[in-house]
């Protein structure tokens, strides 16, 4: 199962309220002052027209919308991805029953919502990103190449030493960072939040280097640079699920 919907922010607020979802991590929603009676009426009209809400004795969500709210209520982890190209922000809400992906395109006020079944999550996480489809096999391969290319090893060391960011630095600010030559080599920032504690627990900064992508991993109090590899991606996917 994969289905896509496009909602205005006001329509999304109304759906969340109807589904008893009081907040969603990682996404900026309209304030109460922006959501007046007229906005409510227009949002309700559009949702009823599209079959997302039915008016009986009270507002009732369609089957897909109920599933969407269930994922938001029960998700264990949230992955927020901001890339230098493409979607301004993409949030993955990951639950046992499947995943819900919200995308806020740069040139649109509408939020794209995708419903993805559990068995499709693994292949979908890296699909549509700016990252290469064929990274290195594993970390060991990158380390072996470093032994013959000192410049590549130095590149990783400089990334760890010079990229002075932490968990409080915004994703968009990180993407604006330039190297010594004024080049923006950071292509994507991935934040992982644990919904048990409602807090950011891991940050991955993808940097385009001489040998594919390097990843600065911030977790707990540790900082390390690893190669983007099939091995790394598999471990990341397993940790998210």
Model-predicted regions and their roles:
Residues 1-48, 54-58, 67:
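Short, amphipathic alpha-helical interface elements at domain boundaries
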């Amino acid at each position: 199962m994969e289905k896509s919907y496009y909602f205005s922010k006001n329509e999304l607020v109304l759906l969340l309220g109807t589904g008893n979802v009081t907040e969603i991590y990682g996404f900026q929603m309209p304030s109460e002052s922006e959501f007046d009676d007229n906005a409510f009426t227009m949002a309700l009209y559009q949702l009823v027209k599209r079959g997302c809400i039915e008016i009986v004795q009270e507002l009732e969500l369609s089957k897909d919308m109920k599933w969407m709210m269930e994922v938001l209520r029960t998700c264990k982890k949230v992955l927020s991805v901001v890339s230098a190209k493409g979607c301004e922000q993409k949030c993955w809400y990951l639950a046992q029953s499947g995943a819900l992906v919200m995308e806020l395109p740069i040139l649109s006020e509408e939020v794209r919502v995708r419903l993805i079944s559990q068995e499709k999550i693994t292949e979908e996480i890296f699909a549509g990103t700016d990252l290469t489809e064929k990274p290195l096999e594993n970390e060991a391969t990158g380390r072996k190449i470093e032994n013959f290319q000192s410049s590549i090893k130095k590149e990783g060391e400089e990334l760890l030493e010079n990229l002075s960011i932490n968990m409080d630095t915004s994703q968009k600010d990180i993407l604006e960072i330039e190297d010594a030559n004024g080049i923006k080599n950071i292509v994507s920032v991935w934040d992982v939040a644990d919904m048990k504690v409602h807090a950011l627990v891991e940050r991955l900064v993808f940097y385009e280097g001489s040998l594919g992508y390097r990843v600065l991993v911030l977790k707990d109090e540790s900082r390390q640079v690893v190669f983007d590899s099939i091995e790394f991606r598999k471990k990341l996917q397993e940790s998210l699920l």
